[in-house]
């Protein structure tokens, strides 16, 4: 989860988020090099007294300032395209979970099993325990196994919402009348927190999401006890 004064991305807990962080670092390095180069050229033009009265056009200069940005864009575009394909890749999911956005709570359905569905509301501040997180904890958590491919189907019943778990690299719009899909896998057990990331009304800030990832044996026991 996010912490106080954290200006970086959250720790990655899925292979997809790990790749997104690699791409972020890669693109930031290229942006930094571009900033240094442009800053050096601008400062050189401002502070030196060199000039050329006879330089009206230069084929070489035009070739350089056309090819150099093109190469930089290619180095950014190729990893980006690979990530876009990974985001849409559906690789034989083990479990399908359906998330439905409402004003202002989420409801979930485990479509592979019978009669497993529930609503998930934020726990009010006056009902929190000492070890709970304000505006992030819910009364019913999503229970999912680790190291398993999960397919998430997302829709809404009223207005636009957005189902987001930053540490897993997931952000999918929940649109009324439309079913969106994504895939993810969690590397380690724990709690993963997220929130609705689309302004959806007065209580938009009070739509948290909590995933509890557990071992596959514990997940089977949970399914058996709730079926």
Curated annotation (Swiss-Prot):
Spans traversing the lipid bilayer: 27-48, 63-82
Organism the protein comes from: Ctenocephalides felis (Cat flea)
Cofactor: binding details: Binds a dinuclear copper A center per subunit.
Mitochondrial intermembrane-side positions: 1-26, 83-227
Binding-site residues for Mg(2+), renumbered to this chain: 198
Annotated residues for binding of Cu cation A2: 196, 198, 200, 204
Keyword field contains Mitochondrion: yes
Assembly, per entry: Component of the cytochrome c oxidase (complex IV, CIV), a multisubunit enzyme composed of a catalytic core of 3 subunits and several supernumerary subunits. The complex exists as a monomer or a dimer and forms supercomplexes (SCs) in the inner mitochondrial membrane with ubiquinol-cytochrome c oxidoreductase (cytochrome b-c1 complex, complex III, CIII).
EC number of this enzyme: 7.1.1.9
Function: Component of the cytochrome c oxidase, the last enzyme in the mitochondrial electron transport chain which drives oxidative phosphorylation. The respiratory chain contains 3 multisubunit complexes succinate dehydrogenase (complex II, CII), ubiquinol-cytochrome c oxidoreductase (cytochrome b-c1 complex, complex III, CIII) and cytochrome c oxidase (complex IV, CIV), that cooperate to transfer electrons derived from NADH and succinate to molecular oxygen, creating an electrochemical gradient over the inner membrane that drives transmembrane transport and the ATP synthase.
Chain sites annotated for binding Cu cation A1: 161, 196, 200, 207
GO cellular component: mitochondrial inner membrane
InterPro entries, sorted: CcO_II, CcO_II-like_C, CcO_II_C, Copper_CuA, Cupredoxin, Cyt_c_oxidase_su2_TM_dom, Cyt_c_oxidase_su2_TM_sf
GO biological process: ATP synthesis coupled electron transport
Mitochondrial matrix side: 49-62
Cofactor list: Cu cation
Protein name: Cytochrome c oxidase subunit 2
Membrane topology: Multi-pass membrane protein
GO MF annotation terms: copper ion binding; cytochrome-c oxidase activity
UniProt similarity note: Belongs to the cytochrome c oxidase subunit 2 family.
Compartment annotation: Mitochondrion inner membrane
CDD domains noted in UniProt: CcO_II_C (cd13912)
Catalytic activity: 4 Fe(II)-[cytochrome c] + O2 + 8 H(+)(in) = 4 Fe(III)-[cytochrome c] + 2 H2O + 4 H(+)(out)
Annotated gene: COII
Keyword field: Copper, Electron transport, Magnesium, Membrane, Metal-binding, Mitochondrion, Mitochondrion inner membrane, Respiratory chain, Translocase, Transmembrane, Transmembrane helix, Transport
